[in-house]
DNA sequence: GGCCATTAGTGCACAGAGTGCAGTTTAATT
DNA sequence: AATTAAACTGCACTCTGTGCACTAATGGCC
């Protein structure tokens, strides 16, 4: 182990992270006020106090402003899965990883983004496209835990089912807003699937 | 019943369909030759013998050129599911609908498009986003078959699982190109899921 | 402190996707 | 033949995203 992982985080790194956060917040506010399509990158840049050109040093695209915060969350999931117990069924490992990382899930921001996506089918599609990254992260984690090549298809299958369960849970959670806690929705969705599936490992 | 459904298909309608097909073929050829990103709509229009502006009377966007042919296929699936037997488990109805419509699935075009998407992650994402339409179509079909509101969540769950199985099947089929028939891949994927799932209906 | 490499940040010009609009041509209907 | 709707074109425009050349700020190092 080389120097563990704390990393002192330099001033520059911190500034960057904070500005990244700032731009995201400004953007979400503008999206909520005027709609996603009607908000141009020029406006976002102006309201954030930077040049339009410089936006692309923080986000690769307009969509990324909404979805990039999920990237590190997905990465955490992958790592958490990789640290799971190989004796358990794959789905159970994923379930535990999701539930144990739920505290780090930014529910408030997700709710705001869901509001922005409402009535914008193009954005919903992009959101869906982004979910492929969750599935890939799950698969990556599972493949680390069970590196043998012959189990790859089984793990792919498990990652598809898992991300399906998560999507189902999120859907219920967003629909019955505030009626259920996200953790319960996720637990229910996995329960439902685990109950119906005889996970033969 | 008013006039049934045969519809004589007027000359105009037919011309439109043929031109639609023609543009698609031209585009796929260009995409294969020069890549998706490097092929502009202006080139496609020129090679198709129409104006760039007029392309948008056939396709809403560049992506649509690749994905629109799936639209009517998905619609067939939905109708086929809606005609299923309500006594069977939902997953079984979907499985039968997929398998019985497989002859109408344009495998050749799908292979070409898969080739185009290879090494283009943005396009893969868009492809993934498009799959939400299959899931919606499945859910639509199932909801027609079981219109009672209280089973909606169960049907949503089934549509997520089904489209997951289809995606798994397609993945295997594309990976082991020509090694297995698509029908077998689909059957296997559903078998696998139906075997592992105790479909309690 | 002063030098230096790196990173933050700007401005400009450009390409390509997609839209609105005003207009012309073509084809089906009566 | 006249009418009407659809096919089709051209133009000007907006917005996203990129390449490039450039300046400003910052951290490390002597």
Which residues does each predicted region cover?
Chain A
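Hydrophobic alpha-helical connector segments
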Residues: 75-115
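Short secondary-structure transition hinges
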Residues: 108-137, 148
């Amino acid at each position: 182990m080389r120097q563990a992982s704390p990393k002192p985080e330099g001033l520059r790194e911190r500034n960057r992270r904070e500005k990244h956060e700032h731009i995201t917040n400004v953007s979400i506010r503008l999206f909520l006020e005027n709609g996603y399509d009607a908000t141009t990158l020029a406006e976002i840049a102006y309201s954030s106090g930077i040049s339009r050109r410089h936006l692309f040093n923080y986000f690769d695209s307009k969509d990324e402003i909404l979805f990039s915060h999920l990237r590190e969350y997905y990465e955490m999931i992958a790592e958490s899965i990789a640290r799971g117990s190989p004796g358990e069924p794959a789905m159970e490992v994923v379930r535990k990883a999701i539930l144990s990382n739920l505290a780090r899930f930014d529910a408030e921001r997700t709710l705001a983004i869901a509001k922005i996506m409402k009535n914008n089918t193009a954005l919903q599609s992009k959101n869906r496209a982004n979910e492929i990254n969750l599935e890939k992260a799950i698969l990556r984690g599972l493949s680390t835990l069970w590196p043998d090549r012959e189990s790859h298809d089984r793990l792919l299958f498990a990652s598809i089912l898992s991300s399906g369960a998560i999507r189902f849970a999120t859907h219920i959670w967003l629909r019955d807003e505030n009626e259920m806690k996200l953790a319960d929705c996720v637990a229910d969705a996995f329960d439902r699937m685990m109950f119906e599936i005889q996970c033969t490992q």
